[in-house]
Amino acid sequence: PEMSFEIVSINKFIQFYFCVPRELKEFVEGQFYAQYPTVEISAADDYTEKIFEEKYAVGYDVQTTKEDVYPIKTFQSFEVDPLSGITSVLSQLSANEEVWIQICVSPASDQWQKKATSFVKAIKSGNDPNEPIWKTILGGLGTIAKTVSAPPTQTASAPTQVDISGPAALAMSGIETKSTKLGFKSKIRVISLSGDYHRARANAGSVAGVLKQFTQTNM
């Protein structure tokens, strides 16, 4: 099933929405109450169905720049709640401006976990998995030094030993940690509305900028 979680600023008022299958409604509500005991949840009309007059809309989809086995930053990596950066941008909008941020998720199969596990094993053993991601790690994560040694009495080469350090080691650790979690297919969309095109574009850019805080720059 697909679920949608949204952060919206309308008339200088920041609101949070979620849309899930009816059979998951109570479960999802329970998750919110567990984390935020004082939260108030109620049914709401679809804010996207209203008529917009004399407003410009600028929108885009957010995509990762690396293969999906790589992790993004999660809340454990932040000293300050990353949500505050997003709400700070939304709080600066004018009364006639709006920004919608939508995150659509649906459960993913275990194939991505198998891909991550196979990738890490291949790198550690010195084998080339013959995948584009292998080129990514070589080109973007630093040099992987290979030390090959063989007994002097044998003509066959011994198994390759791979020394991994620096950003590559951090990447391996991050990929291994991520592969132990449940996975979701996700899509992030952003729409900015304003009576002025340049303001709509600028607000959309501000949201894009704050979303970059989830990038793992050391990988």
Question: Across the structure, where does each feature detected by a protein language model lie?
Answer:
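Extended, folded cores of ATP/NTP-driven motor/assembly subunits in large transport
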Residues: 1-219
